[in-house]
Structure formats: structure tokens, C-alpha cells
């Protein structure tokens, strides 16, 4: 199938879930993926009377970033795509890449709320998905992390997760667009770039073609499994919030750990590591009279009189 037709079809499938008059924001960096997203979405959204506005985030990290953002908006304007530049201040706390991503998504969520947008479309492709899964494997992540990015997650929609980076590049060429090549995408000091430029090509060479597709298939299978486990954990937690040890002991570990995350999240302890959950789990499955477990947000977990007690 022609690349442009394939991308338009992918976008159309997601747009049809919205209504005429809805506002869809588009995250645009100026790269091939996001430009292809912006132009294909604009084409299909018009047919459905859906409004679109492209959001160009200026992280103010690279020299000349303001000029780059303006250039991206000029490209968008050439296609009669409304655009806005949003400047963010990146506080580097856990690496430039992760810190920039956090600042970008915080900006996305704020502007989506301020503009009452129905969704924000992002241009991640199956190549990005494969990289995400590979990095999760390198970290020893669990099923939820290894399931990669969801097509729909809150306000975020990723129509291109079944499409390749090669398709977005080809679509840009067909549309006469010249994408901006972010120098950071060539910088091997970034882990994701090493996965893209070095690890995946070696895997393709040594194990045969189709590695990216295989990783994406595995991610979807893991997502299906993780969704089922999440459903069962939510069902248990909605029916029994006593945190009695006897009841928790009967649960399979994969469900029990999810129940613990739900309970702790209600107290404000979010995004806990596997090690932190393991410390709480030990109060159930490896009880030796140990003391309370201290977690982020000031949450403390103790085993008292046959049940877990959560306090702040």
C-alpha cells in the first residue's frame, strides 16, 4: 500500500472515534514522523469537521531552538495547519532525554486542558515501539513496561504504531516536505539512539529481518496479558480493601503486586519500583517480623494483626 494512503488510513481510523467540532492537538517536533502525522491528520480531519492545532514544543536546550520551532511552524502553515509554539524549561534531573520528555508531556497536558482538547495525537511508529520494548528488556522490566506504548492512553493517541518510520519518510517525500533532523537523534550518548543505530541493526543482521515487527507483536501480546491482570487486580481491590494477609496470600503474585500498587496509589505512593513493591510483598510472603516499609510520599506500610496497614 502507498505510504501516504496507509498513514491516512491509520489516522482516519482514530479520528472516526471523535465527533465533529472536537479539537485534536498534534504534537509536532518537525521530524518525519510528526510532520507526516500533522499533514495526514489535517487532510482526514477536515472531512470529519474536526479541528486540529499543532503544538510545537521548544525545549530551549539546543542552540537555535527558537528558530527551529519557527521553521517548523512555517512548514505547518504552508499546509494551512494552525500551530502554536510552547516554550518549556527543562530541569535536568535524570538525564537530558528523560527530563525533556517530562517537560514536554507536562506542557502537552496543560495546554490540552486549557484548550479543552479531546485528544493529543503523537507520531510514534512501530520502530519507536520496538526500541521501547528493547530498552524495557535491558532494564529487566515487567509485562506492563514491556508492552510498550498504547495506541490510546488518556488524552494521547498514537495512530502510527503499526506503521514504520520508512513510511513516514516516504510520505513526507510524497508531500514535498523536508523534515528537520534533530541532532540528538544521532547522538550515541543517548541510550535510545544506541538501541536504534547499533543494537537493532545487529539483531536484524544476526537474527534475520523482521526483528522490529517481532518485538511489536510481543509487546501487544504482553499488553493483552497485562490488561487482563490489571482487570483482575482492580476487581479484587474494588471488592476487598481490607488488605488482610490471609486474602492476599491466596492471590497469584502477579495480581497481588498489582493490588498493592492500587492500595499504595490511593495513599499517594505512585510509580513505585519493583524493589519497593518487593519490600511490601515481603511483609506478606516472607514475614520474619520485619519493621515497616517506608515509601515515597511519606507512605509507610506495616503488618499488624494479620493485615497490612498503610499510613502517612
Residue ranges and their predicted role:
Residues 1-200:
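Core alpha/beta nucleotide-donor-binding catalytic domains of modification enzymes
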Residues 2-33, 45, 53, 57-59, ...:
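AMP-forming adenylation/ATP pyrophosphatase catalytic core
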Residues 67, 210, 272-275:
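Alpha-helix N-cap and coil->helix boundary residues
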Residues 174, 211, 223:
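Glycine-rich active-site loop/lid subdomains used to bind and stabilize high-energy intermediates
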Residues 202-214:
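Inter-helical turn/loop segments and adjacent helix faces that build the functional surface
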